[in-house]
Amino acid sequence: MANHIAINKAEIRTLIPHSGLMCLLDEVVQWDDRSIACVSNTHRDPANPLRRFGCLSAVHAFEYGAQAAAIHGGLRARAAGTIAPLGYLAALRNGRLHVTRLDYIHLPLQISATRLYGEGANTVYEFILSAATVLVAEGRVTVVQRA
């Protein structure tokens, strides 16, 4: 993976439609044309908008993976001198959760996503969430361009 300059949360917000607290990823640490590596501590934030009754279910790990894919699409478009078309999450496949709750994890989440195929907003990504050496979640998302 190529080492690009780290991208902070303020810049991430310019790449995806998520705003405020729904922008779940804190930093892009590396990316290249095929993949991205991000870090997040928002799973520990009591104000995380995905929490219910103070708990953050592991099912929301899939949103973290999808946001990494969206950020990657935005970075690829920007590198090509364009703006990424709006897309939506059309499918989740092979989703596996290896924990029950994200708020129990006291370490930063590491989110990696790899573009398997597709261009623009019509892409398939594989993602992995981990905390240090512990696998948290994994799956495959399909992003489709809005009509």
Predicted regions and their residues:
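Conserved positions in beta-strands of structured domains
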Residues: 26-29, 98, 114-116, 130
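Small-residue-enriched segments and motifs
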Residues: 23-26, 90, 111-113, 139
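Catalytic strand-loop segment that frames the active site of acyl-thioester-processing enzymes
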Residues: 20-57
